Amino acid sequence: MAAATVATPILQPTAQAQLARKARNVVLVHGLFADGSSWSEVIARLQAAGMNATSVQNPLTTLDASVAATQRALDLQDGPTVLVGHSFSGMIVTQAGIDPKVVSLIYVAARAPDANEDYTALAKRFPTSPASAGIVWTADWGQLSEAAFLRDFAGDIPVAKARVLYSVQSPFQRELLSGKTTHAAWRTKPSWYAVSTEDRTINPDLERFMAKRMGATTIEVKASHLSLISQPAIIAGLILNAAGHA
């Protein structure tokens, strides 16, 4: 059964957030165990609100390649843009977010490292989330097992739908996990963070730590790691807020 919808603001908007420029463009980046279609429910709501939404097909090979794919999408935007990342792609948002077109950053249950920070070492300061034990490797390519995907990644998604999502997950290359950001866009740009309180992929307390450290305007959503699918109205609303359309 899907979790009840809860979106609780836990931090007041920072001065930076209040000064964010209005935008009509949104670039969305997916993380591990997913593909660009994971944003479909959010995109439909953004388009209905008059936003121009672009979902990046993240290659999941190296951090540099993922940032380059996102940069290509940013290059196509015609003005101020909100850059949104889920899960691993918070790394990409942190790096690519320095682009001058990007006026605000949104992290959805996402990694948010500082420049040159070892994210793995940071994550080890918190209890390990169950999903990591479910990664299955074929040579240097990893993906979640079906059991781990249904239980630890998409726990509040109806099983039939979660199985479809499992089938379209893109494998990721081992080298991707060793990449480090060289910039931290959140240090200079307004940031928002959606914590997933029922997350079994990234520890919710780690999410809270990263959100607080960056001074992000933060909400807590009672959702699995896939709040963008189980609670798309909340995530779309957060994006519209960051874009100045709330």
Describe each region flagged by the PLM:
Residues V29-G31, H86-S87, A110, S196:
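Glycine-rich His-Gly loop
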Residues V84-G85, S89, V93:
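Gly/Ala-rich beta-loop-alpha elbow adjacent to hydrolase catalytic centers
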Residues K101-E146, Q173-K180, M210:
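Flexible "cap/lid" loop of the alpha/beta hydrolase fold
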Residues D140-A185:
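Conserved alpha/beta-hydrolase catalytic His-Asp/Glu region
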